[in-house]
Structures are given as structure tokens and as C-alpha cells.
Amino acid sequence: MKIAVTADVHLTTRKDNPERFNALANILSSLADLGIHHLIIAGDLFNKDISNYSQFDELCEQHDKVMVHLIPGNHDPSVEACRFTADNVRAYDEPTRVDLDCTFLFVPYQLGTSMGEVIATEVENLEPGKWILVGHGDYCRGIRQAGSDEPGTYMPLFRSDIDRYKPRDVLLGHIHIHSTDGKVHYPGSPCGLDIGEVGRRNFLIYDTENSAISTHPVNTDVLFFQESFMIIPGNDELSWLKQEIDQRIESWELDESELGRVRLRVRAHGFCNDKQAIADLLKESFGDFAHYKDASPDVSDLSVNNNNELGFIAKRVEEEIANMDWGSCPLEDRAGHDEIMDQALQVIYGGGGS
């Protein structure tokens, strides 16, 4: 059996955020075409302070061939079965085992506890390697999980919990970026909530027969992108920037019909010979796209310094950084190129710029 999985929709009202309802509607419509009859929503279906779920009920009633299984998340802890009227909605506000071709354990978000503590209360009914965990919170592997801008740790699942209780797979909400780490899968948000959630959005399809995970695109009303350019002074700074801009736009891999949905934030930082020319080129090159909150390209962190000798040194330093041998240093512990170059330029130019 194939089951669709999403999370972190953060519905408000159709009036305030129609794009979020449209994204969920697109998922439900896609399931009919794919022949999938179950959708799991792993928490934060609703945004905080939303207590009337009637518009969601109406949407589900329009797609009554799909059974929707959902748990509360940290933003919608009041989700419970009695709040829904649609016949095809199942809300689990306490740990619940559900047979969907195999055993799924739905663990609703609970403040002040861990997923492992909840799993421990159900372990006698869970056959190792034969059950799937659905939860909402942080998967803790000794480092902070990227993709959440919320402080603290929310209902953590530890690697030791997986080793101890042996779920076959884990499907989690809370992190808005799609990611996979071993058997732990985050679908990510199906519609970007703000400029920090960039690119195309997807939902997951989980195959209960073989644990295969695949992604399926969501046709969203908006597509957020952020582009940041590290500028190093030189006679070729404009030609380099133009080439870099073209490559960035190409990397979005959007077709013509999607370009009008882009909401973009652009910034340039570092040092240059001609700040106005950089600003003009950014504005011209991205002129066909709508900018987030109608903001112009941000060049406030771009300084001018025409010292050719320092520019030559900066170019050489960049080459060394690009060829740096990190050895056995884990990827997640490595500083990014721009982060290193920012520090290097401050040393080279000593803050000397205008």
C-alpha cells in the first residue's frame, strides 16, 4: 500500500493564506490521480490560535475517497477528533496504533516529554522492525537539526530510541525542510510559509511493502527563493556577477508557467569597485521576478575598495578556500564558503571600504 505523508501546513483561513489551502487541495487532488487513499499529516496542520476547522472539513469532504490521518503538533496541540465533522478525518490526540497494511504508531505532540518516553508505554504491542512511527518534533543526533527557526527542542526523538525500539521507519513533522537521515524522514512543509522556505515543495509517498520513499511535487501558488552573492573586487566583477546570476536562475529548474510565482530576496555583500553598477545589474537581471515584500536588492553590506593589490590577494585567498582539504571533518561541521570569505575579507581590507 502507498501512503502520502505531509506536515506543517499551518492553515489559517482561506482569506488570510489561500496558498496554504491550495497546496493541501493540490495534494488531495494528486492522490486521486495516483490511486492513493490515505494521507498522513504529521502535526501542525493548523497555525497557532486557529480553533475553527470548518474550512479544512469542507476541503476533506470534497476529497472523500482519501482518509486523512493527523496528529497535533506544537502549534496546534488542541487537535482532537471531536473538533472535526468530515467522515474521512481521523485525529489522534493520544498514542494510537493503526493498521495500514502494517502497524503505524501515531504519537501526538506533547509538551515536556520525548517520543521515546511515549513509545515505551506502547512497546509491548510493537514488533521490532515491523512498525512505523509518526510523530512531531526534533530528531536529535547530537547536533541541532537545520530547518527550524524555533528555539529549543520539541518532543525529541533520540537515536538511542530508534536503536532501542526498532521502528522500521520514522515519519516526522516539525522541520519545514525535506530531509532524510537513515530511516528518519521529514516531508517538509508543502507550501513555503515565508522567504526562508525556498524552492519547490513536495510531499512524500511511503510504500508499506518495501519501505520505499519517493517525493511528489506540490503545485504551489508561491515559490520562495533567496540569492546571496559574495563580491570580490576586480575588473571582471560585473561579468562574473552576470554569469553567476544566470546560473542561479537556471538552478531553480522552473518552467515558464512557474516563473510568475517566484517571490525573491536578493543581496550582495563583500567588497567591489562599483557598488552602483552592482546594484543596477542585480535589479536589471532579476527584474522579471516579484521581490519579497517588494524590496529592492540589498547591497547594504557591500563596501567599495579600489585597491588592486588587495583585490589580487582576495582572489588568491578565495582560490585557496575553494581548494581547501577538510580531511575527515564532517560536512555539517564545516564552515560555508561565504562565511569563511566574509572573515577573510575583513582581515584583508581591515574594514577599509565605503
Name these PLM-found stretches.
Residues 1-58, 127-129, 334-354:
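N-terminal active-site segment of His-dependent metallophosphoesterases
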Residues 38, 47-185, 189-194, 205-207:
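His/Asp/Glu-rich metal-coordinating catalytic cores
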Residues 23-35, 119-124, 238-255:
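A short, well-ordered alpha-helical element
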Residues 210-354:
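Accessory, non-catalytic peripheral segments of nucleic-acid enzymes
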Residues 1, 25-33, 120-123, 142, ...:
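A structural signal for the main folded, soluble domain(s) of proteins
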Residues 173-241:
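A conserved active-site cap/scaffold subdomain adjacent to cofactor or substrate pockets
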Residues 2, 35-36, 129, 166, ...:
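Short loop/turn motifs at secondary-structure junctions
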